[in-house]
């Protein structure tokens, strides 16, 4: 196993052990680069996470990721329409990628929002996570 893969497993396994959870009960999330990492880890894990929530991120390398997908985890991506750091067009590109790869995707473009997480985005994420935890 690669070092990156060993670290992914180690963190997930520690959380599972400490909180007595299954991977299917764990939601992963990230902002900006953390979103990019969450998508990568969540879709290439050998066990499916409950869901992924990403804020202001993008897919780093679509060709590479599409060849490594092992889990079809439900995803919510949220982006501000005024984001100067990670352009909002990345949300649409990611949505297209997920649809083409048959991954359930929900998106939210927040109006008048730059590169941060507003209350509207936090509320949407919380509702998405609740729905996914209840339905699994």
PLM features: what roles do these ranges have?
Residues 92-136:
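C-terminal catalytic histidine-bearing segment of alpha/beta-hydrolase fold enzymes
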Residues 47-59:
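A conserved short beta-strand
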């Amino acid at each position: 196993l690669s070092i990156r893969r060993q670290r992914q497993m180690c963190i997930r396994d520690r959380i599972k052990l400490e909180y007595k959870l299954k991977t299917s009960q764990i939601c992963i999330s990230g902002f900006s680069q953390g979103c990019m990492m969450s998508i990568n880890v969540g879709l290439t894990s050998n066990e499916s996470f409950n869901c992924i929530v990403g804020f202001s991120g993008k897919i780093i390398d679509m060709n590479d990721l599409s060849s490594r997908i092992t889990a079809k985890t439900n995803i919510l991506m949220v982006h501000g329409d005024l984001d100067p750091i990670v352009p909002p067009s990345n949300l649409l590109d990611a949505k297209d990628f997920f649809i083409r790869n048959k991954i359930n995707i929900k998106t939210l473009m927040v109006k008048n929002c730059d590169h941060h997480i507003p209350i509207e985005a936090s509320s949407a994420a919380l509702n998405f996570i609740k729905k996914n935890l209840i339905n699994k």
